């Protein structure tokens, strides 16, 4: 599987991931791992990482996970249809580490759980993303 600089499959890479600084470190059909180094432009006015960063990280990780699984199981594309992310701990610096795991992988939809932890393994955020499987064009 060829990948771009972020580690995402070339055919499913997103410039937005590079803008965030999201790097995929382990990609498989059964889940993936990724990391994101906190930069000043990811902070909200209170000096903590903006919640939208965690939503985006959860969505991107779930989308790549779902795509890789679908590619290996009949092909097609995926699009997110729901993202529910909980923010559990604020951080101001450091690196965040995400892990995705499948909850449901069906013919029409998939549901993925993504957990994000800090460098001390404390839970920062967790989210579920439901994705629609689209037929290959």
Question: Where would I find each of the regions flagged by the language model?
Answer:
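Terminal targeting signals and extreme-terminal segments of soluble enzymes
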Residues: 1-137
């Amino acid at each position: 599987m060829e990948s771009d600089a972020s580690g995402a499959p070339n055919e499913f890479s997103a410039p937005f991931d590079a803008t965030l600084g999201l790097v995929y470190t382990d990609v498989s059909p059964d889940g993936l791992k990724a990391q994101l180094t906190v930069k000043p432009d990811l902070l909200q006015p209170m000096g903590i990482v903006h919640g939208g960063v965690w939503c985006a990280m959860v969505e991107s990780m779930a989308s790549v996970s779902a795509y890789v699984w679908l590619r290996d199981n009949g092909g097609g594309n995926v699009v997110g249809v729901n993202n529910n992310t909980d923010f559990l701990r604020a951080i101001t610096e450091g690196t965040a580490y995400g892990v995705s795991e499948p909850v449901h992988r069906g013919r029409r939809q998939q549901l993925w759980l993504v957990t994000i932890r800090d460098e001390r393994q404390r839970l920062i955020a967790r989210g579920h993303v439901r994705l629609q499987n689209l037929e290959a064009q």
